[in-house]
Amino acid sequence: MRLCDRDIEAWLDCEKLVISPRPPIERINGATVDVRLGNQFRVFRGHTAAFIDLSGPKDEVSAALDRVMSDEIVLPEGEAFFLHPGELALAVTLESVTLPNDLVGWLDGRSSLARLGLMVHVTAHRIDPGWQGRIVLEFYNSGKLPLALRPGMLIGALSFEPLSGPAARPYNSRQDAKYRDQQGAVASRIDKD
């Protein structure tokens, strides 16, 4: 059962759930909390790679990822990031989220943005128990027009679901947690699998 707005507020009040900066009451709706777009992005560089063999040797996968992914792009205040049709980009939420070991989170895009072709997460919308950090967004523009995305705009909504008990292996306690405490638009670390 997902938390309702009253329960979300109660979990925030007792700091069992932490969202920083804390959302104002008008951004807590029914069963969700609105999140905003941060100012960090990452895109694919122009490259000549025919493919990336994701099951190849880890050092080759790592080298291929380094060739195709850009350095992190940090937008100055007031500037827009343009996502063109058919492009994939990584971004990050403005808010940082800390989940307790007995709560899982879910990220959903906004219907108003989806109706323009913007996918906010390609497939990864679960936020594991014990997560701490900003949430990376996997943007894809499936529409016909470029979209101007500005830091601070409403970009998605989080919902939360209590578990039957605390997780035995919460995210931030795992040694193999590839994105522990992420604060930026971190590229794929599939080579760490």
Curated annotation (Swiss-Prot):
Top-level taxonomic group: Bacteria
Disordered as annotated region, ranges: 169-193
Pathway assigned to this chain's UniProt record: Pyrimidine metabolism; dUMP biosynthesis; dUMP from dCTP (dUTP route): step 1/2
InterPro entries (alphabetical): dCTP_deaminase, dUTPase-like_sf, dUTPase_trimeric
Family matches, as Pfam families: DCD
Entry GO MF terms: dCTP deaminase activity; nucleotide binding
Catalytic activities: dCTP + H2O + H(+) = dUTP + NH4(+)
UniProt-annotated binding residues for dCTP: 110-115, 128, 136-138, 171, 178, 182
Entry annotation: catalytic residues: 138 (proton donor/acceptor)
EC number of this enzyme: 3.5.4.13
Biological process (GO), any one: dUTP biosynthetic process
Gene3D superfamilies to which the protein is assigned, alphabetical: 2.70.40.10
Enzyme class: hydrolase
Subunit structure as annotated in this protein's UniProt entry: Homotrimer.
Family: Belongs to the dCTP deaminase family.
Function statement: Catalyzes the deamination of dCTP to dUTP.
Protein name: dCTP deaminase
Organism whose genome encodes this protein: Serratia proteamaculans (strain 568)
